[in-house]
Amino acid sequence: MTEKKEFQVNKNTPFWDASLTDQERIDWLLKEMTVEEKLGYLASSSPDLPRLGIPGVSVGGEAAHGVEGRNDQNGLGKPDVTTSFPQPIGMSASWDPELIRQAGEVTGTEARVVWHRHEGHGLSRWAPTVDLERDPRWGRNEEGYGEDPVLTGKMAGAYIRGMQGDDPKYLRCAATLKHFYGNNTEVGRGWKNSSIDPRNKYELYLEPFRRCIEDGGAEGIMTAYNKINGTIGILNPEVTDILKKQYGLRHVVSDGGAMGLVVTLHHYFGQHAETIATALKAGVDAMSDDPRMVEQAAREAYELGILKEEDMDRSIRCMMETKLRLGVYDRENLNPYDRVTEDDIDSPKAREICKELSRESIVLLKNENGALPLDKALKAEDIAIVGPLGDAWYQDWYGGTAPYRTTFLQGMEVLKQENITFADGLDRVVFRCDGKGLAVAEDGTLQMADEPDVFIKEYWGEGSYTFKSVRTGKYLGARLSESQGEKPKMGQIAADREEAFDWFVMEIFHVEPQEDGSVVLTNRFHYPVYRDAEGFFSFEQTEGTPITMEVVENGIEKAVAAVRDKKQVLLALGCNSVINAKEEIDRNTLELPEEQEMLLDRIAEVNPNTVLVLFTNYPYTLQKAMEKLPAIIMSATGSQDMGSAMAEAVLGTYAPAV
């Protein structure tokens, strides 16, 4: 946990007196604060006020489908285990607002527990995302609730009501809608303009925000990076004119780093002082940016006379209203939602709600001749599961650390109480260079060796590969730390991580065939793999080193052999949640990865009793599957019960549609 500078909290002031109205308490605070102190209170991370004995409380933290408490970016230490529900697009597919409300209640309660662990963090969460799914290629489709504003408003509104609770005075936690508005593409979102005509604006783009504020009671919203009809999201006066005055919204924050981007990407203003002055006047109350930069920009704006103390007071008031409703500044602990214990995380009730919502989020896309559910007479030995998603569970960026992760194979084997034949359909390959093999050394680095290591080649489409060592179970990728290995080097290639995961997924490779049959491997930034004179491999901005990639086991043929004599085949295909589609990355195609299509073709050809089990957070074109297979069933990822819920649906022990 980050250390907070110790000072004496002083609760013997009107600010801490819950018998006063919130406005009276804030009036006292604003009267007592100096201009200098107010300049430091315009960022989402607010500092302590030692002179007044008031500790700082930050807003922020993710909760798309449960509390995100990985703590891999905020310096708070080891991950907080929290309940992980299906992705929002999956929750919405349940069409069950009461069940989603219960999931929101779990999220809000667990946020309270995490708050007590890391006091000052995580009670105002940046969720849900209510941007409409306007393009199936959008990289963040998983975070939204669908393409319909009514559905989005109802389902996201239910999640909000659960998160915040129904007490007339206090909040369980605060929900913050994302992103106001027209945020429907990732590539270029920091500078692009969304041109929206009046009818689409009011009937589609604004409607989910209106419903989630007026009906769901959302406490805040986050502005978008993009321009809307030429106006940058953080500078948009509609924040006040529509959200606050018409819909009754309480507070507004900027997206992360948005204040700085007005100068560096939009090139709209020449200095941050102009940005913060205009943003505060537009109605944005807190800048989610470097607090020191925010404070300095505010100081310069104040000294220039373009930012008034009344502008700061208005924004501080809006943010303080939410903080008081959270109960964090009460002299006595009066918030009924604060009576939580460690037992409220991953509780039996939370598990029950997650399992039920995971079941209900499953969608049956095709079912001819009663192919599903499977015949109850089928034994485990009659079934084969094949495909890269059959025994996989992939972490997504806005998901937390789940208490457990259930894959489809695991779920099926638990219900059948026996092992089931499984083949992932992925090739096993070895790499060679200058007559020697490539292997993972004891320190994890990729080095020359007499005997090459075998790697599982995972192909995710759009040229993106990952390679996992069969021997160590870890993925090849680029080290970003200079403190590892015998020859520390930025960008050195090593097999260090058990999953391909990060903001920039450094385990992604692209394979560029050469005329002589060799390949050059490059990373996502197209830096090639280079071998230096000492035999170490790294990504460099230079000519790549040719490498031979040899298939030593054909994954598709192994899968074909596994299914040939089975009575039933379950073909598990789909996506990795952080490859090819996530924040800052849009898809370029709606097709399944080519190798998954090839696997589908071969399996359908060999065994017509094949059901496609699809684990995905975004749409695919499934023409081949619709033509060749009798049944298709789909689930979003993200749930700790993903695999077991799907197994129940496939075997008929639970019927999602009933």
Task: Put a short name on every predicted segment.
Residues M1-V658:
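Glycoside hydrolase catalytic-domain context in secreted enzymes
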